[in-house]
Amino acid sequence: MAATRAGPRAREIFTSLEYGPVPESHACALAWLDTQDRCLGHYVNGKWLKPEHRNSVPCQDPITGENLASCLQAQAEDVAAAVEAARMAFKGWSAHPGVVRAQHLTRLAEVIQKHQRLLWTLESLVTGRAVREVRDGDVQLAQQLLHYHAIQASTQEEALAGWEPMGVIGLILPPTFSFLEMMWRICPALAVGCTVVALVPPASPAPLLLAQLAGELGPFPGILNVLSGPASLVPILASQPGIRKVAFCGAPEEGRALRRSLAGECAELGLALGTESLLLLTDTADVDSAVEGVVDAAWSDRGPGGLRLLIQESVWDEAMRRLQERMGRLRSGRGLDGAVDMGARGAAACDLVQRFVREAQSQGAQVFQAGDVPSERPFYPPTLVSNLPPASPCAQVEVPWPVVVASPFRTAKEALLVANGTPRGGSASVWSERLGQALELGYGLQVGTVWINAHGLRDPSVPTGGCKESGCSWHGGPDGLYEYLRPSGTPARLSCLSKNLNYDTFGLAVPSTLPAGPEIGPSPAPPYGLFVGGRFQAPGARSSRPIRDSSGNLHGYVAEGGAKDIRGAVEAAHQAFPGWAGQSPGARAALLWALAAALERRKSTLASRLERQGAELKAAEAEVELSARRLRAWGARVQAQGHTLQVAGLRGPVLRLREPLGVLAVVCPDEWPLLAFVSLLAPALAYGNTVVMVPSAACPLLALEVCQDMATVFPAGLANVVTGDRDHLTRCLALHQDVQAMWYFGSAQGSQFVEWASAGNLKPVWASRGCPRAWDQEAEGAGPELGLRVARTKALWLPMGD
């Protein structure tokens, strides 16, 4: 009997050249689920935990809806057990030499290589992502990450001398992130000696499989623990006493809520928020290559978010035409089909993008959809949104996958204004055949990663991160290692949580100031105003506060600054920032050296002021001399603000740039009134920031003496000094939305408030939590920690090719 024809003949295939299915068997994934009796628990301390009386959620194929397994949901006691297991494992893991940790990471990479088919099949089956992206991208990069960080671990004692591991790290991942994002964060943490407790979303078997592979290697079972649970467990994990740092990935609003809930807690917080990226297409670009870049950025399964596309007006019509043609050739389908470009993200993601597109249409946007896409849910076609009014709500919110929002621009300056006008600062690519134009745009973009004529390239040796509301945590390269280290000898962060602190009233009112009697002493202080915009000026409140010496005698009066004065100081700092950041390192160094020389000329006056505050004359003179040396030291360091990385496997360098934060608010400590002020001022200015500073509340006169020299040495607005009630000024600065970062060296309650208030614009915060700092010691007063906190990293990729 003749065979039944089940498909097209070979001749017809060669005539039509149409795609056919290339299915990948998922038998190995189902077999692994069978070993768990189709019931997944948690992997803690090297073994599976399946506690009784726990709720479970189904793990389903997002396309067919088939139930693959059930996943137990963790509760608070499970979280506590996992943290305790990680804490116990940390004692042995961190004590071992880096070479031992390197060997363990290398063995884990080998195990992943042996079981890579199981890993990519399971990930594609459960998430719906295209299997070729997982197989050829994620799994291979996961192995590279382990090998790279094994090398870093083996050289830790020499390369990272002076640093020690933080402890137990809590990792929190959202449903939209793949297992690779977990690898980006656990690899550096494990390499430097930390242990990890990861909280993954319900029905996420791939991270559990990775934990099993790591736990079965042998002597270090508790270094990686994975729990599956709902979002309600996030604050429970983050507030565990044993957790030293929380690495959170998710939406900006979730990050804000976590920032507020962790204010005053012992755990540090690293945020990686949002998924949207940006692509700039100029009129000198190779349009066809740029169109492929759009496809890689928005309509592949590499990234979890959408894309904002800026196209120069002169090539708008041509670029849109070619982009729409390319969209018509995209294929969507089951993730295990090796011939599809896009898989599916599940019903929740489909609902999100449908709402976004409906709202965009209601706001006047044009929507174009194309591609070979199955009609049933949860598939959604590639979508191109254009003509969206700039002031519409959809132009401000994050773009979901698989949507591209396209907008025109006329000049490079306008492109930077539009691109930097959003609160997000994750990643971007610039497409231009003119290197000068590409570098100008790349340097001007306020993002963490920039690719030139490419998009989405990643390498373990290159740092990846963001700025603004995309968070300020990093992974990859040396920056990723420092995320999980603290300076050796410094005590672990202690909780300064005060449950009685009222955030609504803290620092709201300024205590009344009354006449304090006659000034007593050989050298009464001259009347100072606020140093704003390069000159002294009267405070808005037209009020002054008395300053007393160590004997309780009246030493002088300083201006009582308030919210209006802080607003003026921040505006002056913003006006000065572009010019100062654009100065060459040599020019900035010269001005710092000039200020150091001015301090030395004023040595006797400054020493006498310190002597009235209780310091001995020799100690006072030594503080002035050390302050001048600090200025010169940071002036010398300013010359080395970045270096070049040569990436293996790619032709071309990656520039690791150290860029200024912007306007930096600094609240100085009471102790070391001159040295602490200079030690915080010098690195901030050296790296191109402008500052608004609140000097020592006990003796602000020394900082105001320095301001007399800054008025003649520095450009106007570079450094602004506001005196007054510390709590009130702290409140004004912490709540200010145009302050890019804040350092606070004051009380425990003030530290808690600053951490809580920083959630407004998610500014990075460095708070002392009421602990004193040895400013006269090199490690604490001028160590590498200051250099890391005073600037942010930008990775600028310059790949070469045809």
Curated annotation (Swiss-Prot):
InterPro entries: Ald_DH/histidinol_DH, Ald_DH_C, Ald_DH_N, Aldehyde_DH, Aldehyde_DH_dom. GO terms for molecular function: aldehyde dehydrogenase (NAD+) activity. Pfam families: Aldedh. One of its GO terms (cellular component) is membrane. Interacts with SPG21. Belongs to the aldehyde dehydrogenase family. This is Aldehyde dehydrogenase family 16 member A1. It comes from Homo sapiens.
